[in-house]
């Protein structure tokens, strides 16, 4: 049985970081990888004068409900940038999947 990893972190639309870097590296290792974006940023926060930010905390329970309905499970978890408010949701996801 193949193992499945869930990575939970932000998506920076510009900049070599976060999910845009983690996903291809993990996938290249042959690991099936699910993603749960914690937020979407217009660009990386380093080297830019500003950025836009969209928090996805409120979407986490809805995504978990869908995964539970579909009986999606994960064997490992890898987090990047997450907010303090997201930690209880992440623990819930880890427990239930």
Residue ranges and their predicted role:
Residues 2-15, 19-97:
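Ribokinase/PfkB-type carbohydrate-kinase core domain
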């Amino acid at each position: 049985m193949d193992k499945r990893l869930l990575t939970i972190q932000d998506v920076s639309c510009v900049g070599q970081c976060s999910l845009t870097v983690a996903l291809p590296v993990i996938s290249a290792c042959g690991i099936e990888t699910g993603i749960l974006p914690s937020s979407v940023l217009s660009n990386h926060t380093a080297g830019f004068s500003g950025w836009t930010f969209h928090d996805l905390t409120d979407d986490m329970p809805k995504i978990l409900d869908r995964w539970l309905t579909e009986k999606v499970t994960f064997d490992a978890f890898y987090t990047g940038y997450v907010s303090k408010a997201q930690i209880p949701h992440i623990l819930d996801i880890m427990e239930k999947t």
